């Protein structure tokens, strides 16, 4: 396997942890990703972080309720799964950052 990672990060307007967890768990599975583990943390007094460990890398969400938005980031070594996942989210992104990193 070639050392290659596709990375996409940006902001979405949803901040509800239950909605985010359910929506992105479903989309990751639909995209073909192998979800190995999921961890979450609730901050006091508000805020949430979710992290999905994937067989193909990882996906993370960090909510910023004070600003009414969440930061999401996907890193994947599987281009096909990555492209499908990103294509399903194009209407949700507030700003875009899209990178492909090749490691020596």
Pin down the residues of each PLM region.
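Polybasic/polar functional segments that serve as interface/processing modules
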Residues: 1-104
């Amino acid at each position: 396997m070639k050392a290659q990672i596709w990375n996409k990060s940006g902001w979405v307007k949803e901040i509800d942890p239950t909605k985010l967890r359910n929506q992105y768990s479903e989309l990751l599975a639909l995209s073909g990703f192998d979800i190995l583990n999921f961890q979450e943390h609730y901050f006091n007094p508000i805020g949430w972080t979710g992290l999905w460990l994937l067989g193909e890398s990882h996906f993370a969400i960090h909510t910023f309720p004070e600003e009414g938005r969440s930061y999401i980031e996907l890193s994947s070594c599987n281009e096909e799964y990555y492209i499908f996942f990103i294509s399903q989210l194009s209407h949700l992104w507030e700003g875009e950052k899209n990178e492909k990193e090749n490691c020596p």
